[in-house]
């Protein structure tokens, strides 16, 4: 009998899909991710179901669409009634450990207004055992730095300023003050190795989170100079940001509102004013941060190999969301463009190698990760999960009833650091959009703003809105109906498979039935 399976769920932050060498990013060096891709299956059409971090991680770990979990923005609470991956793992005998963060604001009905968790961007999701948390306020990391003998500056975040400088005007080619040996990526790796070494052969589940390549976009030596800006792909954008802004009121708001200071510690000015040379340098730094994470993963992978646990460990690599990186003159993860939503997903399952090295083109979403892990460990996803297990796709091509489009959402209500709701004159519950997209067309529906429609064959980068073009009227109607049907099929369904009968309670779907609506 084979030993119980281990699971390593690696969740990086803000790593977009087209920065994966196995998918064509040949300008990058990621030997450890490359190994994972060779031994597992890489999903080419994978998206997060929402952005930014908190909502995205809520979907990843609950298996629910934004429309169902309703933790719609960073700082918006997650209803305590929802189960999640960690709670489900406990039901089948695992003690789920977490390194990193989940950016979860707790249900205020379970605490009180003075709870310190309500003063931070987010805390840990219930059910996980923290063995190296970043939150709250990165205290775990800064405490580790101090324990290593590093003299923290009065403003702790100043460790991400360039060496010898008190501020940075924007993009920089300088290394940050902190060394690679003391970076946050190293901190998470050390926590992971400490946890793994203490398991003593017992089965484990570890959520291993990394903060990078999330901003600030500054890397420690030698990663700051590992890539030449001239080797980076050019940004995809109109000749000027004003042309982009004409596409939609929400895009116009972000082009005017997003500041460089959110991406370069101490910088000023609008992100949309970055010239092409600056974007190339920013991308080179971003690539360096990616390689730093990959080198750290190499240490974890080496330990698994040397201790005989590599072959018995399911490894899933993914990101919470993407990053615009100057495409469409934007920085961050906002709006509706692919760059914010398309993310990596690589799955290597212990004992499954029939499709090792394959690139799977089926449409997959972050809500699929939870059902995949639970099924791999002999459990089952909750009835209300919006995702489907990916295990069949590890053995053969997608089944005939697999989804035929991607679905993702974004809520842009005001939070303390961004106020689109106020700027656009909307109520908070009007600040919502959803997207349905296949290989041919992309439809963006807004609760209270004009829709968008793109012909992806003719306009893959989505510059021309065809929603009002009479030639496309029938297509717009078709995809609007697809969006409505998708939402109706995935309405909350925790108890809808039960019914009372004269003979008593009847369950219409067996608990282990894996069928899910597309």
Question: What residue ranges belong to the model's regions?
Answer:
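Short, charged, surface-exposed hinge/linker loops at domain edges
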Residues: 492-509
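A contiguous, mid-protein "functional segment" used to position or interact
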Residues: 470-497
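Intrinsically disordered, low-complexity polar regions and short flexible loop motifs
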Residues: 459
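Charged/polar positions within long, soluble alpha-helices
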Residues: 302, 448, 488-492
């Amino acid at each position: 009998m084979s030993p119980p399976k281990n699971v390593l769920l690696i969740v990086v932050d803000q790593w977009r899909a087209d920065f994966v060498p196995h998918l064509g990013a040949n300008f990058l060096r990621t030997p450890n991710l490359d190994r994972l891709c060779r031994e597992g299956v890489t999903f080419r059409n994978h998206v997060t179901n929402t952005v930014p971090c908190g909502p995205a991680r809520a979907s990843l770990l609950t298996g629910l669409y934004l429309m169902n979990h309703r933790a719609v923005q960073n700082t918006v609470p997650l209803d305590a009634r929802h189960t999640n991956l960690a709670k489900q793992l406990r039901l089948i005998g695992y003690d789920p450990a977490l390194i990193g963060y989940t950016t979860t604001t707790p249900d205020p009905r379970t605490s009180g207004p003075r709870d310190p968790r309500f003063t931070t961007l987010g805390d840990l999701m219930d059910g996980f055992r923290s063995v190296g948390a970043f939150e709250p306020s990165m205290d775990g990391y800064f405490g580790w730095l101090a324990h290593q003998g590093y003299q923290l500056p009065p403003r702790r975040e100043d460790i991400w300023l360039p060496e010898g400088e008190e501020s940075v005007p924007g993009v920089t080619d300088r290394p940050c003050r902190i060394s690679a040996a003391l970076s946050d990526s190293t901190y998470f790796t050390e926590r992971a190795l400490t946890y793994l070494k203490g398991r003593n052969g017992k089965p484990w589940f570890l959520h291993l989170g990394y903060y990078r390549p999330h901003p600030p976009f500054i890397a420690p030596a030698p990663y700051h100079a590992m890539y030449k800006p001239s080797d980076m792909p050019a940004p995809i954008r109109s000749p000027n940001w004003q042309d982009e802004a004409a596409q939609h009121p929400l895009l116009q708001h972000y082009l005017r509102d997003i500041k460089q200071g959110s991406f370069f510690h101490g910088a000023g000015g609008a992100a949309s004013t970055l010239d092409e040379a600056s974007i190339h340098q920013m991308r080179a730094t971003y690539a360096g941060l990616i390689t730093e994470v990959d080198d750290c993963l190499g240490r974890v992978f080496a330990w698994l190999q040397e201790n005989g646990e590599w072959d018995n460990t399911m490894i899933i690599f993914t990101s919470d969301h993407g990053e615009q990186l100057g495409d469409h003159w934007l920085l961050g993860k906002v709006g509706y463009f692919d760059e914010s939503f398309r993310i990596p997903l690589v799955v290597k399952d212990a004992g499954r190698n029939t499709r090792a090295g394959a690139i799977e083109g089926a449409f997959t979403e972050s809500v699929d990760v939870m059902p995949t892990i639970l099924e791999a460990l002999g459990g089952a996803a909750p009835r209300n999960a919006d995702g489907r297990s990916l295990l069949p796709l590890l053995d053969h091509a997608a089944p005939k009833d697999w989804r035929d489009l991607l679905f993702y959402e974004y809520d842009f209500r005001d939070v303390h650091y961004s106020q689109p709701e106020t700027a656009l004159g909307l109520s908070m519950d009007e600040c919502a959009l959803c997207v349905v997209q296949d290989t041919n067309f992309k439809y963006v529906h807004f609760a209270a703003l004009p829709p968008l429609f793109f012909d992806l064959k003719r306009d893959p980068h989505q510059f021309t809105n065809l929603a009002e073009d009479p030639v496309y009227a029938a297509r717009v109607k078709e995809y609007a109906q697809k969006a409505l049907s998708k939402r109706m099929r995935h309405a909350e369904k925790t108890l809808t498979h039960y019914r009372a009968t004269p003979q008593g309670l009847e369950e219409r779907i067996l608990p282990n039935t894996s069928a899910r609506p597309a």
